[in-house]
Swiss-Prot record:
Enzyme class: transferase
Modification sites for N6-(pyridoxal phosphate)lysine: 681
Listed name of the protein: Glycogen phosphorylase, muscle form
Source species of the chain: Mus musculus
Cofactors (names): pyridoxal 5'-phosphate
Entry GO CC: Z disc
Reaction(s) catalysed by this chain's protein: [(1->4)-alpha-D-glucosyl](n) + phosphate = [(1->4)-alpha-D-glucosyl](n-1) + alpha-D-glucose 1-phosphate
Amino acid sequence: MSRPLSDQDKRKQISVRGLAGVENVSELKKNFNRHLHFTLVKDRNVATPRDYYFALAHTVRDHLVGRWIRTQQHYYEKDPKRIYYLSLEFYMGRTLQNTMVNLALENACDEATYQLGLDMEELEEIEEDAGLGNGGLGRLAACFLDSMATLGLAAYGYGIRYEFGIFNQKICGGWQMEEADDWLRYGNPWEKARPEFTLPVHFYGRVEHTSQGAKWVDTQVVLAMPYDTPVPGYRNNVVNTMRLWSAKAPNDFNLKDFNVGGYIQAVLDRNLAENISRVLYPNDNFFEGKELRLKQEYFVVAATLQDIIRRFKSSKFGSRDPVRTNFDAFPDKVAIQLNDTHPSLAIPELMRILVDLERLDWDKAWDVTVKTCAYTNHTVLPEALERWPVHLMETLLPRHLQIIYEINQRFLNRVAAAFPGDVDRLRRMSLVEEGAVKRINMAHLCIAGSHAVNGVARIHSEILKKTIFKDFYELEPHKFQNKTNGITPRRWLVLCNPGLAEVIAERIGEDYISDLDQLRKLLSYVDDEAFIRDVAKVKQENKLKFSAYLEREYKVHINPNSLFDVQVKRIHEYKRQLLNCLHIITLYNRIKREPNRFMVPRTIMIGGKAAPGYHMAKMIIKLITAIGDVVNHDPAVGDRLRVIFLENYRVSLAEKVIPAADLSEQISTAGTEASGTGNMKFMLNGALTIGTMDGANVEMAEEAGEENFFIFGMRVEDVERLDQRGYNAQEYYDRIPELRQIIEQLSSGFFSPKQPDLFKDIVNMLMHHDRFKVFADYEEYIKCQDKVSELYKNPREWTRMVIRNIATSGKFSSDRTIAQYAREIWGVEPSRQRLPAPDEKI
């Protein structure tokens, strides 16, 4: 029996997600039934909603495996250059819906589950996020995997299968509490363990110098077991692989010391080895020099390089070389991209393999290494740069330290030859930093050992060349490139905002989904009343849906007709959630001052996690919740102003809040946010941006036109000038009454009556040592926010500006980013050609 179709349901029949054929639906129902009984061993009397989710996941996965095997066979036959994306983080989120979107199965699965009396959306909500990342860097890696598959590149993501991903955030009494993220508790239907490809990784030991060369001996061995996850491209039958390594103790672990009777203890101690892949370090833009973290970094690199070389040697190309010891062709067959410095040990490890094991001479090995590796820089914050203590490396990786010293010696010889007599330049450029603690500067190692170095937005790449890597740019300018970040439009539009994807497809067709520049065609609809109405309607539906979600999950009631003002990202001083707080308090004080004056109602939502050891970030969360407690319970405010802290912000929550946002807050101090990618997601989903000229905001404003962007605040040059003059917060405090009032409220306990000095650390920081100059941008920010409210009063003009933003967001597809990496760094040509489906003849 079929349900009556609403207009919206009828429209789904012309969906961008592919039609549900009748055979398709009955086949899916049959497979669902089979998996429930034979894979999960449940019947409908005992099956839980989670069982139904797993049955659906296995049913969808069945459609992946044929394409996955086919793709790998295709790569073996054609032997293209392989791209290896090395990252300590892959922030994948959920997999079910993304797989259905990319395989055009969503409608059929929706219909099949409906016919079985189930709600697909409810089943999708059961899936755990794969939270193997902190924020932007890990999510970028995930978007890149999607684009590499969509562009038909023979690419592999390599990382660590953390047993515990980024912690779950609970807010208790306004404070962040962390809970372990046991995401594998119920199993993961998307991964396939590959124990047959387990590889040894060595630690500690010592170096023996023999007539044959150096030997690393007496090491401790940990095994790396790979788990493979399929990565489907968008409707091209390509399925690439993400391979994540899990640490396992070898069977003889601690037993070869055979201390009598120590058998039980030796088996219990296996945990120590297996701790390497236990947990993701929860630091974003902060370096913590812990031995376990260094072990993680070497673990992923050592296992991955063995795998890369095994695949190179057993390739069709490799097998034509009978002894397989010739690495001349290696850089033509292999590209290694280092996602930040975390996998930088790939450089000395590849050198160790080529020199110590494959017996290449140093110069040849170095040539191969440099031509193979490329490095992406993600931050200019000094506290985020990796600088490993020599004493740690000496103990853990003695041979690698020797190799780094040799690399450094030869590198500095080149510098000295290029800049004779410039001794200070040698000190600045050395890979080894002298000081109280001798350290290895991993960024310097990456630049020396790579043929390409890129920043992630135009302004960031310029800052690298002009400031932190200036010396290196002067030595080898040809190495430095820009690759502005992007986001995958599959997850960040089609999946999370089907209503908007549909409205767009009705005007310009569906091809934009894999060619986002086509959104420019929407510029001709900027005065089309029907389109304006449709875009506004979708936004309102998304806002209602998100309001219902907040009410259901968090029991908070919000006004869906208010302006949804959203700042979601990691909590960090440089991202300036505090500036947002100052605006909230300003609005509150204005309401209290003139309670009868009309004000555009706002719901201000802030979400994000603070690193567990980052005191100031945790205080910022407490401040946001404290402001909310005052504002949300003041009857004078009514529904004109609401402050919501979005607990446990993660990929799956981003997919809900971003489509509902009206205003996107991108307010970092100019020169601190390398790129940002949340900014792009909001732009694509029909929010307007208030932001500084920082990171990718600069290019977004350039694409949309500055008149369609709410730009405020100091530019990079202004910040530099202010630094030279000396930033003095007191000046702003004295000059701006509204600001002074806020600081007095924070100091006197207005927002913390039970503990009046609760926010003294925040006040002290803002007044005396604010590296990120919050007060310097306060006035312009408030004025700019007033302009936002003014425009919001005119819904038609607001929506026209939204359309201009959506139409010019095409540049920020990760497909464009990856096509540029492919052509300009990896030397491969992207392709949108489909592979034959598993049931098609090749």
